[in-house]
A protein has these predicted regions:
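Intrinsic disorder/low-complexity detector
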Residues: 1-137, 180, 211-215
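Acidic, proline/glycine-rich low-complexity IDRs
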Residues: 2-11, 15-19, 158-215
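Short, conserved helix/loop micro-motifs enriched in His/Cys and acidic residues
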Residues: 74-84, 155-169
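A short linear-motif detector with a strong N-terminal bias
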Residues: 89-92, 139-144, 171, 182-184
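Aromatic-enriched hydrophobic runs in primary sequence
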Residues: 118, 147, 151-153, 169-174
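An N-terminal amphipathic alpha-helical segment
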Residues: 123-162
Length: 215
């Protein structure tokens, strides 16, 4: 992911001289954290999970080959653990409810995207392409809702989910109308909504992130 590479470059560029190489155990702990977060997010395939984790690590002195082998093993362990945990989940999770809400909104002309682009700025810049594609298929579009990759990570870490929203028509009133429609669909699906109708605020959904894995 581009934003991960940028973070990695900053980390390397800002690093102070090291008086001791990082221990392998320390790097493996850090590696496990990145892998577990992407795995539990539920949108990234196995190869990308490993690649993303290695991109943000200082690979020396242990080398990429060594850490990649450990990363594969860690991913297998974390996947088995997550499948075991998910067996005890309720039949309907908060993420299932989110998907129900998004599906309902799509029928109402609100284009909804999950884990969409690296950040909010890129999401707002690129959602127009998704709207255009929907219009080309003959569907009506009044607005959009999405959360980006960093939002997914925050949700996995227990911070709930934040949604961007907007309208195809300019101005505050159309955007707020779309926001209210989104909030209503989320509540109908059984999710709590923390949003006071302020145009300058994103919609917060204080959910428990439980997304079933395809791995």
């Amino acid at each position: 992911m581009v934003w991960r590479k940028i973070v990695s470059l900053f980390r390397r560029g800002d690093a102070k001289p090291s008086y001791g190489a990082p221990k392998l155990e320390e790097q493996l702990d850090e590696l496990r954290g990145y892998i577990a977060r992407d795995l539990r997010g539920g949108y990234v395939d196995a190869d990308a999970i490993v690649d993303n984790a290695l991109e943000v690590l200082e690979l020396q002195p242990h080398g990429e080959d060594v850490l990649r082998a450990h990363a594969r093993r860690i991913l297998e362990d974390e996947t088995a653990t997550y499948h075991h945990e998910s067996a005890a989940w309720p039949p309907l999770t908060d993420h299932d409810r989110l998907e129900q809400a998004f599906a309902a909104l799509e029928t109402q002309g609100v284009v909804c995207r999950q884990n969409f682009t690296c950040c909010g700025t890129c999401g707002v810049a690129e959602i127009g392409d998704e709207i255009d594609a929907t219009l080309e298929r003959g569907g009506p579009v009044h607005g959009y809702a999405f959360f980006h990759m960093q939002d997914t990570e925050r949700a996995v870490e227990g911070g709930g989910l934040w949604l961007n929203y907007g309208a195809t028509e300019g101005g505050e009133a159309p955007a707020l109308a779309v926001g209210q429609r989104i909030a209503e669909a989320l509540r109908i699906a059984g999710l709590a909504v923390d949003w006071d109708g302020d145009w300058n605020k994103r919609i917060h959904v204080p959910l428990q992130w439980q997304r079933r894995l395809a791995l």
